[in-house]
């Protein structure tokens, strides 16, 4: 009996080793998580059928004299029996996959056992079917609770399965005396070994999946913590101050040697090893970062040469570089460095891939929030500066004066005032409008201003029809025209010209120009215009600052507001993508 127990333990050990290997394969772990799908069930049927066949082939042959022999057997003599781990594999198949998998594996295992032959081989087909169904029932109960049977319960089920096996031998064997003799020899070893094996097999499955869940929970906690701490800085956009704070947070929360963040052209921050030469404000040093900016794909390297830093004493030996995107365009990179290449593992790569998507989304959310605030600010500025009570009452007084002199002109101005109010309210709720709508709003505004000051301004709008559906930010031209009216001409009563034009810049971009022949802008204010508020007698200059921020936020730095100014006039322009409104 002791010899049989030791031989069975060897077979169970082989099964357990294979189970451990399988549970460390990501595909198999994923299969266990999908075990209730039919595709997964069929795959489990195949896997556990192979286990069952191996259990049959590696069984221990027992003859009438209780002699034991262990090898690989395909066929057995008619007067011998076989002790094996078949019940273990069928039982685990049912506990994992439910009744269908348990029955399928039981039938396959039983048919193969009949094919092998031996004394009363048909008994084992019957017992295998019973074991598969009963184990599957317990497995189904656990599946409904979205769990696996506990280790203790698995051991108890293993004992029950072996007892069913022994009862089947006693019930269906032709030679009852031989059946009793066989059971007295194999019952205790097989019950002990196979029940323990079942418990160990299930413990490997449960512990591996639980470990993975715990790892995911830790990663999720870390990622959420990163998100919560970095989101306020991502809202500010990618600048040196925000990038420095983000890099410090990532360095503190993750096991990395250094963290760096770059824009498309320069290092914004570098925290940790190598900070003596990876200095913010410098141009990007590593060829690795340049490759990621060019390809837009995450890259992982494990040597100093692959990093591509030209500094001879750079301690960085491995890195993973994540592209940061906004609206599909690469705006920078996040780099995590390691001084020991072995610290860059599969887990770090998975985490980095997840962070790439999260950080890019945070940048977009931050930009969207910024744009929303800017648009809201533009609405407020527009209503304050252009639709103020002063402007409104002046327009009404002008219209009232015209009623007696030229009622038709008064009616037209009243319609223009109505359109102007409506256009301001609608434009404040949109990120972009067509150039045609923007020009209509400008004309409405100019009609009211020219009615108040007849002959003071000459407005020339030179825009080809093909450009009228180009998308522009609301208030773009209106703000520039109003700026010219308020600031360019001071007290000059006539000869004041404002030209609005749109020309082709490239095959994909257009240039929008607003030009006046006013007195120009003083040199002490030129470098501030569009970058910050500029105080003057008639305003703060914040409208131009707001407009410039919206242009850069929507279309990138290349769309920034530009200007030239001399004593004979000022020209404002911006270059925008030739994006047209889709036809409905």
Curated annotation (Swiss-Prot):
Record localization: Cell membrane
Keywords, ordered alphabetically: ATP-binding, Cell membrane, Hydrolase, Kinase, Membrane, Nucleotide-binding, Phosphoprotein, Transferase, Transmembrane, Transmembrane helix, Two-component regulatory system
A single GO cellular-component term on record: plasma membrane
Catalytic activity: ATP + protein L-histidine = ADP + protein N-phospho-L-histidine
Record-listed Phosphohistidine modification sites: 390
Domain Histidine kinase: 363-580
Matching Pfam families: 5TM-5TMR_LYT (PF07694), HATPase_c (PF02518), His_kinase (PF06580)
Effect of residue 390 to A: Complete loss of autophosphorylation
Keyword Glycoprotein among UniProt keywords: no
Deleted gene: phenotype: Deletion significantly reduces target tissue survival during calcium-daptomycin treatment and increases susceptibility to host defense cationic antimicrobial peptides.
E.C. code: 2.7.13.3, 3.1.3.-
Molecular function via GO: ATP binding; hydrolase activity; phosphorelay sensor kinase activity
Biological process per Gene Ontology, one example term: signal transduction
InterPro entries per the UniProt record, alphabetical: Bact_2-comp_sensor_kinase (IPR050640), GAF (IPR003018), GAF-like_dom_sf (IPR029016), HATPase_C_sf (IPR036890), Sig_transdc_His_kin_internal (IPR010559), Sig_transdc_His_kinase_LytS_TM (IPR011620)
Processing after translation: Autophosphorylated on His-390.
Transmembrane segments: 6-28, 40-62, 88-110, 123-140, 155-172, 184-206
Residue ranges constituting the GAF domain according to the UniProt record: 311-362
Keyword Cytoplasm included in the entry's annotation: no
Membrane topology category: Multi-pass membrane protein
Protein function: Member of the two-component regulatory system LytR/LytS that regulates genes involved in autolysis, programmed cell death, biofilm formation and cell wall metabolism. Also participates in sensing and responding to host defense cationic antimicrobial peptides (CAMPs). Functions as a sensor protein kinase which is autophosphorylated at a histidine residue and transfers its phosphate group to the conserved aspartic acid residue in the regulatory domain of LytR. In turn, LytR binds to the upstream promoter regions of target genes including lrgA and lrgB, to positively regulate their expression.
Protein name as it appears in the record: Sensor histidine kinase/phosphatase LytS
UniProt organism field: Staphylococcus aureus (strain NCTC 8325 / PS 47)
């Amino acid at each position: 009996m002791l010899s049989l127990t030791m031989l069975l333990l060897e077979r169970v050990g082989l099964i357990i080793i294979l189970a451990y290997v399988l549970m460390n394969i990501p595909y198999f772990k994923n299969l266990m998580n999908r075990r209730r799908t039919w595709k997964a069930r069929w795959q489990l049927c195949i896997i556990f059928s192979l286990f069952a066949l191996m259990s049959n082939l590696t069984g221990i042959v027992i003859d009438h004299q209780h002699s034991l022999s262990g090898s690989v057997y395909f066929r057995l003599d008619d007067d011998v029996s076989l002790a094996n781990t078949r019940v273990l594999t069928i039982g685990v198949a049912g506990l994992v996959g439910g009744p269908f998998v348990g029955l399928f594996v039981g039938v396959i295992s039983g048919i193969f056992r009949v094919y092998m032959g031996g004394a009363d081989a048909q008994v084992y087909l019957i017992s295998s079917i019973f074991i598969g169904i009963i184990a599957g029932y317990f497995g189904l109960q656990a599946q409904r609770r979205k769990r696996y049977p506990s280790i203790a319960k698995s051991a108890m089920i293993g004992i029950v399965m072996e007892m069913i096996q022994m009862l089947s031998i006693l019930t269906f064997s032709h030679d009852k005396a031989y059946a009793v003799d066989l059971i007295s020899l194999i019952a205790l070893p097989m019950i002990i070994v196979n029940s323990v094996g079942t418990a160990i097999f299930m413990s490997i499955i449960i512990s591996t999946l639980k470990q993975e869940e715990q790892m995911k929970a830790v990663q999720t906690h870390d990622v959420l913590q990163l998100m919560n701490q970095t989101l306020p800085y991502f809202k500010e956009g990618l600048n040196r101050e925000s990038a420095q704070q983000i890099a410090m947070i990532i360095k503190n929360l993750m096991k990395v040697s250094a963290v760096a963040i770059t824009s498309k052209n320069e290092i914004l921050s570098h925290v940790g090893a190598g900070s003596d030469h990876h200095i913010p404000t410098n141009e990007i040093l590593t060829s690795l970062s340049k490759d990621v900016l060019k390809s837009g794909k995450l890259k992982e390297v494990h040597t100093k040469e692959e990093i591509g830093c030209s500094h001879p004493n750079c301690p960085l030996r491995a890195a993973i570089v994540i592209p940061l995107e906004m609206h599909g365009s690469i705006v920078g990179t996040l780099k995590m460095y390691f001084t020991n290449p072995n610290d860059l593992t599969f887990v770090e790569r998975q985490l980095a891939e997840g962070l790439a998507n999260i950080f890019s989304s945070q940048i977009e959310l931050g930009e969207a929030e910024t744009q929303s605030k800017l648009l809201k600010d533009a609405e407020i500025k527009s209503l304050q500066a252009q639709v103020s009570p002063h402007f409104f009452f002046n327009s009404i007084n002008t219209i009232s004066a015209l009623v007696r002199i030229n009622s038709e002109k008064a009616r037209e101005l009243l319609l223009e005032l109505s359109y102007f109010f409506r256009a301001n309210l609608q434009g404040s709720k949109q990120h972009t409008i067509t150039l045609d709508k923007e020009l209509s709003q400008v004309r409405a505004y100019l009609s009211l201003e020219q009615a108040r000051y007849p002959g003071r301004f000459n407005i020339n709008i030179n825009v080809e029809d093909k450009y009228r559906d180009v998308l522009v930010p609301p208030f773009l031209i209106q703000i520039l025209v109003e700026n010219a009216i308020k600031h360019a001409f001071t007290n000059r009563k006539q000869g004041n010209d404002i030209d609005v034009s749109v020309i082709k810049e490239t095959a994909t971009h257009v240039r929008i120009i607003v030009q006046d022949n006013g007195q120009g802008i003083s040199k002490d204010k030129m470098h501030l215009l569009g970058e910050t508020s500029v105080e003057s007698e008639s305003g703060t200059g914040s409208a131009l600052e707001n407009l410039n921020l919206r242009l850069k936020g929507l279309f990138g730095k290349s769309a920034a507001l530009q200007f030239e100014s001399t004593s004979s006039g000022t020209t404002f322009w911006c270059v925008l993508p030739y994006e047209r409104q889709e036809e409905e």
